[in-house]
Amino acid sequence: MILPILGGPTGSGKTSLTQVLDPKRFEIVSFDSRQVYRDLPVGTTAPTPEECSTIRHWLIGFLNANESINANQFSLLARNAIADIQSRGKIPFLLGGTGFYLRAFLLGMYPVPTVPKETKDYVFTLPLEEARSQLLAKDPKAMESLSDQDGYRIKRALEVVLTGVLWSDVSKETVGGFWKDNPEVKIVGHWLDWPREILYQRINTRVETIIRGMLEETKEVLSKYGPDCPGLRTLGYNFALAFLNGMIDSNTFIEQLAQSHRNYAKRQITWFKKESFLSPISYDAAVQLYTNIEQR
């Protein structure tokens, strides 16, 4: 069984590439932790209804902004989607920018305990330096496997430690994993690689096109669910909230939003470079490769 996978940083053209795939052969399984929200399609740059009508997308826009999902739940949904696609003789095409979700799906997850919402909320508010300091104090060995600047994983480890379980204990071995359960699968995995200057130009241009719609959807979500809902915690919406609250002007909003997307792209690239099942590929080469891939 062939399993095509394409990762890439924000702004790299992942969605546009899906538009050249044959919808009679492929369906897209999205691995994007931000595009799960139906209320926030603009700020998360989710595929448009027109793009989704060209080729079917799974795991896009299925949560309200007041709902949340974790990597384990996402992995189960992805398994179901892949089984459905294969049952109809099509090829599931895994696509997205959330490397953690992709890795968890393929290789499994650490058997971590359930973390109370209050603990998650507390850790979320901590500056990275404070979270790192607390983790070092409570579980020094945990930091041996974590980058000092990996805010997501540091805070995730701290959440677990605050439940009374050492991250250094539970992170020794993963359980589950689609690839581990199906070793016959042959992954054809790449991530879209652009010269950094061109990628940043693409990101800056994209930000200018989404700000109006992003502000409108932020207002709507605010009126429905309030400022603390999970959807508004995703990338960039803190700047939209700051602008709507009069804390920053429009120029600052645009500058900070663009910078946050560029920083996010840099983190995504760092993650993808570390994955042994993915290798860099240019956009044109990816089109050539994936449009001609054959299922076996």
From Swiss-Prot:
UniProt region (Interaction with substrate tRNA), positions on chain: 32-35
Xref: SUPFAM superfamilies: P-loop containing nucleoside triphosphate hydrolases (SSF52540)
Listed Pfam families: IPPT
GO aspect biological process, one term: tRNA modification
Catalysed reaction equations from the record: adenosine(37) in tRNA + dimethylallyl diphosphate = N(6)-dimethylallyladenosine(37) in tRNA + diphosphate
InterPro entries on file: Dimethylallyltransferase (IPR039657), IPT (IPR018022), P-loop_NTPase (IPR027417)
The EC number(s) this enzyme carries: 2.5.1.75
Binding annotation for ATP: 8-15
Keyword Magnesium assigned: yes
Gene Ontology terms, MF aspect: ATP binding; tRNA dimethylallyltransferase activity
Record's keyword terms, sorted: ATP-binding, Magnesium, Nucleotide-binding, Transferase, tRNA processing
Family: Belongs to the IPP transferase family.
Name of this chain's protein: tRNA dimethylallyltransferase
Species of provenance: Leptospira biflexa serovar Patoc (strain Patoc 1 / ATCC 23582 / Paris)
Gene that produces this protein: miaA
